[in-house]
Regions:
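Ubiquitin-like/PB1-type beta-grasp interaction modules and other compact soluble beta-rich domains
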Residues: 1-83
Length: 84
């Protein structure tokens, strides 16, 4: 029986962040009501200053830090785009 007070999510890392985090993807279980911001804090994901890292939640780029995570959510941390 699944824990009804928790959500299981998958995180995906791209670019240099994949090297910093030491993995391409991580699956985690968090307390119900956890947000994207909570996830960043818990795993110390480097988002300081103008890192340019964008967050996609379930395929939607630009997820706010106060977005409440749902069971089965997929959160991707995308490197800045470079034009040319």
């Amino acid at each position: 029986m699944a824990d009804e007070l928790a959500v299981r999510i998958s995180m995906f890392f791209f670019g240099q962040l994949k090297d910093v985090m030491g993995a391409e993807s991580i699956e985690v279980t968090l307390p119900l009501g956890s947000t994207v911001g909570d996830l960043i804090s818990r795993f110390e994901i480097p988002m300081e200053g103008n890192s340019g890292i964008r967050i996609a939640a379930d395929g939607n780029i630009g997820a706010p830090l106060d977005l409440v995570l749902k069971d089965g959510s997929e959160i991707a941390f995308l490197p800045p785009s470079s034009g040319g």
